[in-house]
Amino acid sequence: MINDTIADMLTRIRNANLAKHQIVQVCSTKMTRNIIKVLQEEGFIYKFEEIGEDNNKYLLISLKYKGKRKKPVITSLKRISKPGLRVYANYKELPKVLGGIGIAIISTSKGVMSDYHARHYGLGGEILCYIW
């Protein structure tokens, strides 16, 4: 059983990027699905689809590469708020990842969104991860 599905998802994506895989399979939860939707909206992945039965669902994520050498669009992923140490910030304290090149994924009262959208709506929340 996986205790931290978000960290597991980020690790699977990181490993698939390093191995230059086109598709990666991750466990489907409401939170991982919402994070993947944000990644798709921000252009870090092509698409995703949910497969499996009710109690055993998975997400198939199509990763994005650029150039002839298939350089990954996602350079790095970092988990920030962990089950043992939650990290929260209001909208004024939300970090800019690499000066705005990357994104922070925030869990707010209005759902999971990027740091840009959270700042725009004036929402703070739990900082789940950084992606650049």
From Swiss-Prot:
Gene Ontology MF terms in the entry: rRNA binding; structural constituent of ribosome
GO cellular component, one term: ribonucleoprotein complex
Main localization (coarse): plastid
Pfam family, one: Ribosomal_S8
BP-aspect Gene Ontology terms: translation
Domain of life, per lineage: Eukaryota
Protein localization: Plastid, Chloroplast
Assigned keywords, A-Z: Chloroplast, Plastid, Ribonucleoprotein, Ribosomal protein, RNA-binding, rRNA-binding
Summary of subunit composition and partner proteins: Part of the 30S ribosomal subunit.
Function according to Swiss-Prot or TrEMBL: One of the primary rRNA binding proteins, it binds directly to 16S rRNA central domain where it helps coordinate assembly of the platform of the 30S subunit.
Family the UniProt entry places it in: Belongs to the universal ribosomal protein uS8 family.
Protein name: Small ribosomal subunit protein uS8c
Source lineage: Eukaryota, Rhodophyta, Florideophyceae, Rhodymeniophycidae, Gracilariales
